[in-house]
Amino acid sequence: MKSLITFLILLFPFADKRKPGNPLDSLPKNIEILTRFGERADFSPDNQRIAFMSKSFGDAMLIDLKTRSIRCLTCNVPAAAFLRVMHLSTGDYILIGPDHFEDIGISRSRDNELWFLSKERGSKPVKLEQKMSEGAAVSKKSLKIAFALGRSQAPDLAVGASRIIMADLDLAGSTPKLVNKKTVYESMDQSCTLEAQDFYDNDSKLTFVCYEPKGQASVMGIDLQTHQVTNYSKAPGSYNETEGIFPGGVYTCVEADRQCEWLGGDRGPGNIDIWKLKLDGSGKDFVRLTNFNDYEGGKASNPVISTDNKFMAFQFARTTDPAGVGYGILLYRFTK
């Protein structure tokens, strides 16, 4: 009997303490539902609209935050299979995704590429002739972008290696193109698989994710002048994926699994919620912003911050779905 009691005591801290129900039914007053579908939100430069994806391998959409009207940006593209839409500082768009859907693995990796879409109504996406991995960092101040490459997009890389490329988008000619491409950081193996996230400090620095083995990840940053790299999360053995940065570059949103310390459940990219991390290098100033993972199967993900620091847009998601899949865009109002 004593052995059984000891076993139960040891087991109890790791038991899943999440509650049943839907987090959308118990939202705090500063969070509202914008849409009942969609994923991967992005604020317009004037913070008046939010672009988002209808679904993975789908169309890019745009919601007006004043009228709440929604229009499709890519419905003139037959069988559109885009994964991401992001605003440029000009109000135009960067699209990410394959030119057609083949299968989830190939279309998300080997065939994933960058596109330019003009803000003029009726415009069609234009290929930038650049394959890339996952998402991209798009400057809010200039036409600078950064993106990662893996072996699927760059055969010269060793198996497991990845690199981050920085480039400028040239819109001066008749066809948009990427110029001034240069490698800013490279990982030689799978101990750190790279993904670019956000420029900050007047485009002099870049946040990126270091995806690590066993479902772990770290929040990283690089000074683009000195090339000094900093691990900002400093939390080995846990999942910390940097997302939208706050204006001023002092804080960033992070998809993190830290709540698993008291809620239990498997750590990693499934059981995540949105946290706010101070980029001071200590890894200690971590504040939880959402509590969706308090519910069985629930999580909040893919947060972005408005440039006036008043709002965060994010999505409702499920722990069992692949990263990026969402079921609606929500708006979080920061209170003073």
Residue ranges and their predicted role:
Residues 16-336:
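Sequence signature of WD/YWTD-type beta-propeller architectures
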Residues 1-2:
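N-terminal hydrophobic targeting signals that begin at the initiator methionine
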Residues 5-16:
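Hydrophobic h-region of N-terminal signal peptides that target proteins for export
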